[in-house]
Swiss-Prot record:
Its main location: nucleus. CDD domains: PWWP (cd05162), RRM_SF (cd00590). One of its GO terms (biological process) is regulation of DNA-templated transcription. SMART domains: PWWP. GO terms for cellular component: ESC/E(Z) complex. It is found in: Nucleus. Disruption phenotype: No visible flowering phenotype. This is PWWP domain-containing protein 5. A motif (Nuclear localization signal) lies at residues 352-359. It comes from the Eukaryota. Residues 310-452 are annotated as: Disordered. Component of the PRC2 (polycomb repressive complex 2) complex which regulates histone methylation on histone H3K27. May influence gene expression by regulating the function of the PRC2 complex and modulating H3K27me3 level.
Length: 632
């Protein structure tokens, strides 16, 4: 790693050199001279690793007017002298072949790249050669330049400052590629001969496709001095992992340290020869995504959710045009599977529709099952009745593993001991008179308290410096979840009872079979005809009471008419069309279903009626209190 003096951030004499004939796509990989891998011992642990060969699709930009100042990078160079087995060194510059650096170009920010000897320069690069400058191959595309010492800075020491220069897609992509190379070097530096030959070769080899590097020199081997076993500090890694477990986020300026620590953990995992190595990496990437989402500014619901906020730091029209054209190549230039995941509004919306579509089918199955089996309750329906559009987004992250989606399979294989969501979708509700007090029932079940459950989740942080596997009894979470569901149902009935009218009456005649299903389930009828306590139907009954679907819109102009609402929602089941109400002032619409099952199906399928577009802010289910009659 170079330790050059700070350069001046003025426009350099180095111009951008390119392949002037074509756009080339390929793997833009960093490389380095072969450094003898070292086995190391830290707390009696020998760390090995495997890695995946990282790729990025890049392009060489055509610029016939650009001029390049050359650099003499051989043994007689004024900058680099005394070539040895590990690379090049210089008394003043201390620059090594394949070092990671930041280099400055006119009209561009400081850009991450690799320094190379002129002996590997391509014909196109040698046409711009000038003695005294260094050949730099840039990350993110196939471009290169000849830079002098004042236009080069060490990568690690200046990362926090340099990464804040721009939010353009190509700049962020170049940084991701550089970080990917840092990760590879760290993993390679912690490797030893005990790993498989195939895995070891993937780690030590880098393939470079750059307009300034000859094809026969595109394969590079090894690591660097900053990434070997000597620089590894196990105690600091364990402290970092403990902190990350408690606070799973990090500042953008700390991303380099995060990548280094992650690579060290991956190396240790490979030494342990875990069969689900890729699953662990997926888990690490999910932490990166969580940190990215947590740092996003809040946006209005009608504008959608955007996890990628882009800013343009360059104001001249030429550079803005360049950014637009290269942004189309961003997807092709990603540096491999370890890049941070990014969500945009469209993909998030499509995922939401997919989840809600699958939930709709499951909802119908649960309805049929509830009609055949008494005393069963759908926990999912109760939870959904309180969700708005924003809450549904949260449901994707927290509830998907509970409903058998693709995320469940991935997370189950990822952390097989963490499965608090395996509780059954319906729970048996006992009769009010025969129920035991909840605290007695919990004591009999020996359910752990929330504090105990939380402490068990943190049990992996041991004093030995190595995270242990987390052993959690899933039955505790099943019983705890069942208890929460029953409390939720009881609270729902209790709140509804407050809004209902308690009066002295006897069983009443209903107009149709649908209303017969709405008979209060918790009536206590005495033979002498004394007072009957009229309550609401318990949530464990075999048929759901009528519900209204309430829709909230962004503005009054987007609220559809009552006829339009009836036409849209009658496909889910019979409606009380006369009760469909539209409040323009409140920007609200209400559709009343005759059967609760139909309302639930419509609610679960809310993502399908995209006819409302972004004007639909939220939707929820509202219980409709049935009318009561006195009979003799």
């Amino acid at each position: 790693m170079s330790t050059e003096p700070e350069g001046v951030e003025s426009d350099s004499n180095a111009d951008f050199a390119i392949n002037a004939s074509s756009f080339d796509y390929g793997m833009a990989h960093t490389s380095e001279t072969l450094a003898d891998p070292m086995s190391f011992q830290a707390q009696d642990l020998v760390v090995n690793l495997t890695g995946v060969e990282r790729k990025v699709f890049v392009s060489a930009r055509d610029d016939k007017d650009s001029l390049c100042n050359g650099v003499d990078f051989d043994a007689d160079s004024d900058l680099l002298k005394n070539k040895d087995k590990k690379g090049f060194s210089k008394e003043n510059l201390k620059l090594f072949d394949s070092d990671l650096v930041w280099a400055k170009l006119r009209s561009y920010p400081w850009w991450p790249g690799l320094v190379f000897d002129k002996s590997v320069a391509s014909k196109a690069a040698m046409r711009h050669f000038k003695k005294g400058n260094v050949l730099v191959a840039y990350f993110g595309d196939c471009t290169f330049a000849w830079n002098n010492a004042s236009q080069i800075k060490p990568f690690h020491q200046n990362f926090s400052q340099m990464q804040e220069q721009s939010n353009s897609a190509e700049f962020r992509d170049a940084i991701d590629c550089a970080l990917d190379e840092v990760s590879r070097r760290v993993e390679f530096g912690l490797s030893c001969s005990c790993v498989s030959e195939e895995a070891y070769n993937k780690l030590k080899t880098q393939n470079i496709i750059n307009a300034g590097i000859r094809e026969d020199s595109s394969v590079r081997y090894g690591g660097d001095k900053l990434s070997d076993g000597i620089s590894f500090e196990p105690a600091k890694l364990v402290d970092y992992m403990k902190h990350l477990a408690c606070f799973p986020c990090y500042d953008a300026t700390e991303k380099l340290q995060f990548v280094i620590n992650r690579a060290q953990v991956l190396a240790f995992q490979q030494w342990k020869d875990y069969s689900h190595f890729i699953d662990y990496e997926t888990f690490v990437r999910s932490v990166e995504s969580a940190a990215t989402l947590a740092s996003l500014p809040e946006v209005n619901m009608d504008e959608g959710i955007s996890a990628k906020k882009r800013k343009t730091d360059y104001k001249d029209n030429a550079e803005q045009t360049k950014e637009k054209t290269l942004s189309d190549l961003t997807v092709k230039k990603r540096c491999g599977s370890r890049s941070t995941e990014k969500l945009d509004g469209k993909s998030h919306s499509e995922k939401k529709r997919k989840v809600e579509s699958s939930e709709s089918g499951k909802s119908e199955k649960r309805i049929k099952k509830s009609q055949q089996k008494e005393d069963s309750v759908s926990k999912h329906s109760n939870e959904e009745s309180l969700l708005s559009v924003g809450d549904t987004n949260k449901l994707q992250k927290t509830a998907e593993p509970c409903h058998g989606t693709g995320v469940e399979n991935e997370m189950n294989s990822l952390t097989p001991t963490l499965k608090p969501c395996r509780a059954s979708k319906s729970t048996e509700v006992e009769n009010e008179k025969t129920k035991k007090p909840r605290h007695q029932e919990l004591a009999e079940r020996k359910i752990s308290s929330p504090d105990e459950m939380l402490s068990s989740l943190h049990a992996a942080n041991t004093s030995t410096g190595i995270p242990d596997s987390i052993n959690i009894d899933p039955s505790n979470y099943e019983d705890f979840e069942k208890f929460i569901n029953e409390l939720f149902c009881s609270k729902l009935n209790g709140d509804s009872k407050k809004a209902s009218i308690t009066e002295t009456s006897e069983p009443c005649d209903k107009k149709d079979s649908a209303e017969e299903e709405i008979l209060p389930a918790n009536k206590e009828i005495t033979g002498s005809g004394s007072k009957e306590q009229i309550g609401l139907k318990d949530c464990s009954a075999d048929s759901l009471p009528p519900y209204a679907l309430v829709l909230n819109f962004a503005d009054s102009g987007s609220v559809p008419s009552e006829e339009k609402l009836n036409e849209i929602f009658k496909r889910y089941g019979p409606l009380h069309e006369s009760k469909t109400k539209v409040t323009m002032k409140g920007k609200r619409a209400k559709v009343v279903f005759k059967r609760g099952e139909d309302a639930k199906t419509a609610f679960s399928s809310a993502g399908k009626y995209s006819i409302f577009g972004p004007s639909l802010l939220s939707y929820r289910l509202e219980y409709v209190c049935p009318k009561r009659k006195k009979t003799t």
